[in-house]
Every structure is written in structure tokens, then in C-alpha cells.
Curated annotation (Swiss-Prot):
GO CC term (a single one): nucleus
Gene: SETDB2
Protein source organism: Homo sapiens
Tissue: Ubiquitous. Highest expression in heart, testis and ovary.
Ranges of compositional bias, category Basic and acidic residues: 520-530
Enzyme class (EC, first level): transferase
Binding positions for Zn(2+) 3 per the UniProt entry: C299, C345, C351, C356
Protein name: Histone-lysine N-methyltransferase SETDB2
Length: 719
């Protein structure tokens, strides 16, 4: 009882410190007046009748065991004469009453007032709900029974935008910290269900959800990490510029934006929740998936689930794998990185999508993220709540391009250089070096990738971007049969990571550079992506063509690939990264899969990924052979310059709290993994989320980019 009183006292002290005590009672009074008027004139809904009855009934029970039902009006007035219990229950029931105070169900003056203070109301609701849930079910005792769907409380009407770890609490679960015995010094977390059953670990949570056939709570909504707090208090700063959801409702959870430093807004870009074109549009359906499962118990048994076996089988072939069997997720959390990728259950699988523990990335982000302005690194991303280790954060999305197109559109010479661009780069070097870092690094004069390594290695000249405002992340693979390695980000000049296995080799090449807008207002010319077929060219950067491409893929689920060959000098065979313009940021991921060959032809095969009107009539004629050729030996860029998701704003850190994991969702074709970010440790609320770009300092002597991550083990330089 003392603990409850302490919680209530803390609740009101916090409101008093914020000067919101008067505000909350004004809101309660408005709610009561609204309910009173509607009951008197008969315009109240059933929900409002019930809310009013519960409010008065519970307020009366505080001082008397006699319910308001059957009591006379005189008794009610007598029992309600003490104002303190009534107001206490009013604030406890405020969270139930507020939803009915919409513009449709309340007085006009109340509606206007609530709209202007909406953020404060929602914040207060969260605090009140947490206190009320704890108070209402703390004395619940467990009685032996077989759990079923009747043990669960009804799901709240709207859970979107909530802390995912708060959802069980809103469904009348209790999260408790306790010692396992009197001699133990460590605290452990346990959950108490609405029916009184104790859940001591995630395995018991899964069994309970399986028994109750729950379809609105999942194992990743529960955390048994004692460091994770469900409602962490942090000082709030004044927002200069903000946005409730930069995804405009595309994501399952709103992605907010907040600038507490200046009035600068996010650069214009098209929000894409996943990669476009979709992988299933670029893959022959007959070879899209190599296996599928029909599990009935959540896909946790590797002896029964074909998808878990596929992940384990590929992981075993990796020279980096351990002797321990790797199955991927453990109850929807990733315990360690799997170089060969995770194969999630697909649309061909017959398992229950809600109970399946091997479906994570395909459900989209669940944690609350916020894009914000950092002090030194430009835009960044932070979490608004505590996140447990192994939690999925987001993917890196964008537009999938054919590198051949980007090279052509930029007019790169055979040596991969642009003399005018190089002059701009070095003339701006000193001026821009101080102002930029991590997510906003100025021009990067380096060879963005190396050539595919053959038995006889030759060096390629570096290629410079003609746009000093971009971030390019690039990954290249030389094919190992049945192996897909993680996209290791390494400096490409001569530091390529090469893995030998079964007489074949795989190399990873990636690089990136980011720049803020120049102080002189320099803006590079905007490049256009061209669709070509049989000599015809169309500008695909226009909104009309963009919309056409989107509609085409949705309606036909088929994409045509145009192929042509172009003779190039031997030196241009070096696969060099091309870059695209961006007002603030450029990120791309390039993947190449090739088999090393003796006496390789000097012809460079170029294929166009995108469709235009002229290709529409040819889509039905696309054969499986042409798709196979498209996947073989081609280079793709995942470009987030103008289109992408929240992942495009993630910064670098030498000690990151995110790891990068390839995940196969829409196809098992190793050309098209989703690049997903998971937490590699517990992350506290309001902490910036970062990943290691993987550069090695000193690889480009002409350019130095200093790191601003500020960790103890900082490498001081990104390049």
C-alpha cells in the first residue's frame, strides 16, 4: 500500500513541478461537464454512459463497499461529499474519459482547447494509465485453470504510436522486479498476466500467447532485461521545428522529427518503407524461394521448420561460423550477427503469421524512432524508449538502380575521373572539413570501390564523385556457391576483405561519404536516371514516370529488364561507384555477384532496372533466362538520395549500438537481401542510434575526415 501511495505522490509531484495540476483538473472538469450535459439531453453514446457509470461507481466504492447501483441519490451525494477521493479517481479514470472528448463528442470550446494541448494530454494519459493499471490488478491472485482466450483483456482500440513494451501493460499485464530468493542480490523481471499467472521468461510468454491464441501481443513486446524501463523520464527541450510523422502514415509506427537547435527542416525526399523495385519483381517466381515451411507452433523448432534449417545450413558453410547451430532469431530478437543472412518465413509458408517467431523484418519497425538535429553530425536518429538487445530497428531502403545507368548518366570517363569535380573537391576541402562529419561529411575524393578481383589482381584508379554532397555505401560480392555474406563496409582502395572458401572467393567493397550543404550555397546539378531500350531514352526523374513505375509494378508485378552491351577500355572494367545528388545526404548500397573467370571479356554488360512506357508491352515477354542473366554479374545500387526511409539518417560511430544484418524476405535470391539494423546491446531512451561505416583511416591520404562520435575508443578519423 505504501508503494502505491508513493507512486501516487510522485505522480502529483511531477505534475506540480511542471505546473500542470490546474491543467489536469480543468480537463477532468471539462470531461465531467460534457458527460453530464450529454446524459441530461440524451445524446450520450453507450460508451459515454458506461464511462460515466464507471467513474461515479468507482469513486463511490472508495468510501463504501456499497455500489452506486441500488443506492439512492441521497446516498450518492453523501458518499461523494469528500472531494479528495472523487478527484483522485477522476484523475485515475481520465485516460478512459479523454478518448470520448473528440471534436464530435464534446462542446466546441472544449474541442478547441484540447486540440491545442493535445501533446500534453497524451503525455499525461501515459502516466495515468501506468499508475491505474498497477493499482487495479496488484491484488490479483492466481487460481489454477487452463489458460484460453478468455484470460486476456480486450485489446485497446488504438495502440499505434505506443512504446511496444508498454502494450502488455495497457492490456492489464504487470511487469515486476523481484529476487528469485531471499539470498539473491540480483533483481529479475517477471510478468503477471490478467488471469494472475506468472511469466518468468520469454519461453513462458510464448507458451501463454500460444495457449490464449493472442493476436495483438507478441514476444518482442516483453522484455526481461532489468535495465529496460518502460517509462523513462528525461528532460524535454524546446522544439524549434517538429513533425509528428515524416513517413506520413506509411510505417506501422510514426517516425517523428524534432529540431531543438535551429529552424532547419529535413531535406525533401520521398519516403519509401522498403526497397523499390521489390525483389519479387526482379526474380523469376519459380526460383524465388528455395524452401518453405508449414509449422503450426510458431517456427521455433529447427527440426521441423524448413526456413530455420535454411538459415542454419547456409550459416554452417561460412568460414566465420562457429560450431554452434545458428537458427537466426530467438523469439524475434537477434542474438548475434549471421554473415550468410537470415531467411525469414515467406508468403509461401503456411505458418501462422502472428505466432511465427521467424517473421520480424517483414512486419516493419515497431520501436519509436525520431529524426533529430545533432550538435556536430547533422541529422541523426534516436530512440524514444528503452530498447532491448537484439531488437529490430529498421531497414535501409531506397531505389534499386543499375550501376551501368548511373555511370552513363554522369558521363564518367574511362578512368572514372572528372577533372572539374576533382578541382571542386580539393578547393573546398579545408573549408568543409571542420563543419562536417559522419552523416554530413563533405566531398570524399577516394576510389569508391575496387574492381572485381580475379586470379591476377590489377589496381584500378580511384573514381571521384561529381557531387560533393553524398554518402555512398557500397557492397560487392564475388559469388560463392550458396553463400551470402554480410555487407561488410570496408575501404575499397586496397583493403578489400577477401574470404577463401572451396577454391572460390568473395570480396566486400563498400564506401561512403556524406556532405552538408556548402557554406557558399553550392548545389550540384541534379542528375536524371534514364530508361533506355533500343536507343530510346526517357527521363525517369519526373514525377509522371515515377508514378508510372510504381503503378506498373503494383499492377503487373512484373518488371522488364533491357539488356545491351557496350565495349569499354580494360581500365574501365574496374567497378567504380557512381553517386547521385542530394540536397543533404546520399547513401547507396551496391551489390555485385560474379563468378571469377579466366580470360574475361572486356565487354561490360549493362542492364536497365527500371521500366518506362515503351517497356510496358514487353513485360509479358520477359523470360526466366533473361532474369537469370540480369542477376548474374550485374551491379546494383541501393540509392536513398531522393527516396528512402529513416535509415538514411543513421550516423556513424566507432562503437555503434546497431549491427547490420542481411535478411531475405521477398526472395531467397542472394542478389536482393534487405539490409536490416538490429540493436547489439541495451539502448537507453533518447540515445542516438548508430552503426559502423567500417572505413579504415589513412586509406586515402589526400583526404582526412574526422570522426565526431566521441566514444572512448574513437578511431578519430573516418578516413
Amino acid at each position: 500500500m505504501g508503494e502505491k501511495n508513493g507512486d501516487a505522490k510522485t505522480f502529483w509531484m511531477e505534475l506540480e513541478d511542471d505546473g500542470k495540476v490546474d491543467f489536469i483538473f480543468e480537463q477532468v472538469q471539462n470531461v465531467l461537464q460534457s458527460l453530464k450535459q450529454k446524459i441530461k439531453d440524451g445524446s450520450a453514446t453507450n460508451k459515454e454512459y458506461i464511462q460515466a457509470m464507471i467513474l461515479v461507481n468507482e469513486a463511490t466504492i472508495i468510501n463504501s463497499s456499497t455500489s452506486i447501483k441500488g443506492a439512492s441519490q441521497k446516498e450518492v451525494n453523501a458518499q461523494s461529499s469528500d472531494p479528495m477521493p472523487v478527484t483522485q479517481k477522476e484523475q485515475e479514470n481520465k485516460s478512459n474519459a479523454f478518448p470520448s472528448t473528440s471534436c464530435e463528442n464534446s462542446f466546441p470550446e472544449d474541442c478547441t482547447f484540447l486540440t491545442t494541448e493535445n501533446k500534453e494530454i497524451l503525455s499525461l494519459e501515459d502516466k495515468v494509465v501506468d499508475f491505474r493499471e498497477k493499482d487495479s490488478s496488484s491484488n490479483l491472485s492466481y487460481q489454477s485453470h487452463d489458460c484460453s482466450g478468455a484470460c486476456l483483456m480486450k485489446m485497446p482500440l488504438n495502440l499505434k504510436g505506443e512504446n511496444p513494451l508498454q502494450l502488455p501493460i495497457k492490456c492489464h499485464f504487470q511487469r515486476r522486479h523481484a529476487k528469485t530468493n531471499s539470498h539473491s542480490s540480483a533483481l529479475h523481471v517477471s510478468y503477471k498476466t490478467p488471469c494472475g499467472r506468472s511469466l518468468r521468461n520469454v519461453e513462458e510468454v510464448f507458451r501463454y500467447l500460444l495457449e490464449t491464441e493472442c493476436n495483438f501481443l507478441f514476444t518482442d513486446n516483453f522484455s526481461f532485461n532489468t535495465y529496460v524501463q518502460l517509462a523513462r523520464n528525461y528532460p524535454k527541450q524546446k522544439e524549434v521545428v517538429s513533425d509528428v510523422d515524416i513517413s506520413n502514415g506509411v510505417e506501422s509506427v510514426p517516425i517523428s522529427f524534432c529540431n531543438e537547435i535551429d529552424s532547419r527542416k529535413l531535406p525533401q525526399f520521398k519516403y519509401r518503407k522498403t526497397v523499390w523495385p521489390r525483389a519479387y519483381n526482379l526474380t523469376n517466381f519459380s526460383s524465388m524461394f528455395t524452401d518453405s515451411c508449414d509449422c503450426s507452433e510458431g517456427c521455433i523448432d529447427i527440426t521441423k521448420c524448413a526456413c530455420l534449417q535454411l538459415t542454419a545450413r547456409n550459416a554452417k558453410t561460412s568460414p566465420l561460423s562457429s560450431d554452434k547451430i545458428t537458427t537466426g532469431y530467438k523469439y524475434k530478437r537477434l542474438q548475434r550477427q549471421i554473415p550468410t543472412g537470415i531467411y525469414e518465413c515467406s508468403l509461401l509458408c503456411k505458418c501462422n503469421r502472428q505466432l511465427c517467431q521467424n517473421r520480424v523484418v517483414q512486419h516493419g519497425p515497431q520501436v519509436r524512432l525520431q529524426v533529430f538535429k545533432t550538435e556536430q553530425k547533422g541529422w541523426g536518429v534516436r530512440c524514444l524508449d528503452d530498447i532491448d538487445r537484439g531488437t529490430f530497428v529498421c531497414i535501409y531502403s531506397g531505389r534499386l538502380l543499375s550501376r551501368a545507368n548511373t555511370e552513363k548518366s554522369y558521363g564518367i570517363d574511362e578512368n572514372g575521373r572528372d577533372e572539374n569535380t576533382m578541382k571542386n573537391i580539393f578547393s573546398k576541402k579545408r573549408k568543409l572539413e571542420v563543419a562536417c562529419s559522419d552523416c554530413e561529411v563533405e566531398v570524399l575524393p577516394l576510389g569508391l570501390e575496387t574492381h572485381p578481383r580475379t586470379a591476377k589482381t590489377e589496381k584500378c584508379p580511384p573514381k571521384f564523385s561529381n557531387n560533393p554532397k553524398e554518402l555512398t555505401v557500397e557492397t560487392k560480392y564475388d559469388n560463392i556457391s550458396r553463400i551470402q555474406y554480410h555487407s561488410v563496409i570496408r575501404d575499397p582502395e586496397s583493403k578489400t576483405a577477401i574470404f577463401q572458401h572451396n577454391g572460390k572467393k568473395m570480396e566486400f567493397v563498400s564506401s561512403e561519404s556524406v556532405t552538408p550543404e556548402d557554406n557558399d550555397g553550392f548545389k550540384p546539378p541534379r542528375e536524371h536516371l534514364n530508361s533506355k531500350t533500343k536507343g530510346a531514352q526517357k527521363d525517369s526523374s519526373s514525377n509522371h514516370v515515377d508514378e508510372f513505375e510504381d503503378n506498373l509494378l503494383i499492377e503487373s508485378d512484373v518488371i522488364d529488364i533491357t539488356k545491351y552491351r557496350e565495349e569499354t577500355p580494360p581500365r574501365s572494367r574496374c567497378n567504380q561507384a557512381t553517386t547521385l545528388d542530394n540536397q543533404n545526404i546520399k547513401k547507396a548500397i551496391e551489390v555485385q555477384i560474379q563468378k571469377p573467370q579466366e580470360g574475361r571479356s572486356t565487354a561490360c554488360q549493362r542492364q536497365q532496372v527500371f521500366c518506362d512506357e515503351e517497356l510496358l508491352s514487353e513485360t509479358k515477354n520477359t523470360s526466366s533466362d533473361s532474369l537469370t542473366k540480369f542477376n548474374k554479374g550485374n551491379v546494383f545500387l541501393l540509392d536513398a538520395t531522393k527516396e528512402g526511409n529513416v535509415g538514411r539518417f543513421l550516423n556513424h560511430s566507432c562503437c555503434p549500438n546497431l549491427l547490420v544484418q542481411n535478411v531475405f524476405v521477398e526472395t531467397h535470391n542472394r542478389n536482393f537481401p534487405l539490409v536490416a539494423f538490429f540493436t547489439n546491446r541495451y539502448v537507453k531512451a533518447r540515445t542516438e542510434l548508430t552503426w559502423d561505416y567500417g572505413y579504415e583511416a589513412g586509406t586515402v591520404p589526400e583526404k582526412e575526415i574526422f570522426c565526431q562520435c566521441g566514444v572512448n575508443k574513437c578511431r578519430k578519423k573516418i578516413l
